[in-house]
Regions:
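Tandem CBS (Cystathionine beta-synthase) repeat/Bateman regulatory domains
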Residues: 1-144
Length: 144
């Protein structure tokens, strides 16, 4: 079975905990994605900000979006897979954590990519993807 590097999006947009949510949202628009990894100064993932995190943790709570930053909305710690992880390992993590995207880290723990259900589906792993979509889409799913 292929590993995650064969299907991941390499060098994804990322931000720091101090990045304004307005800038995070702009990154999502510019990169046509719903998740931005939050990294430290060594580019190691600390967490992720999803469009759902912004809606639920900031907007729905009535917090000021003009002063909120990535750290205020991020899901942490980041669930990650290593570059040498199999697609099956990524699917299992997505299913267990009820997530649709997983940051990929290199041997040093630095962000190198993101793998998503869509990436796996496009790679022809439709059976595994259908099962993950079913699992993460059930009512009560924790996060997008």
């Amino acid at each position: 079975m292929s590993n995650v590097t064969s299907v991941m999006t390499a060098n994804p947009a990322c931000c720091t905990p101090q990045t304004s949510l307005r800038d995070v949202a702009r990154m999502m628009i510019q990169n046509d994605c719903g998740q931005i990894p939050v990294v430290d100064d060594q580019n190691a993932p600390l967490g992720v900000v999803t469009d759902r995190d912004i809606a639920v943790r900031i907007v729905a709570e009535g917090r000021d979006t003009n002063v909120a930053c990535a750290a205020d909305a991020m899901s942490s710690p980041a669930q990650t897979v290593r570059e040498d992880s199999s697609l099956k390992d990524a699917v299992c993590l997505m299913e267990a954590a009820k997530i649709r995207r997983v940051p990929v880290v290199n041997a040093s723990g630095r962000l190198s990519g993101i793998v998503s259900i869509a990436d796996i589906a496009l790679a022809g792993k439709k059976t595994a993807t259908a099962e993950v979509v079913k699992e993460v889409s059930e009512p009560g799913s924790a996060r997008a």
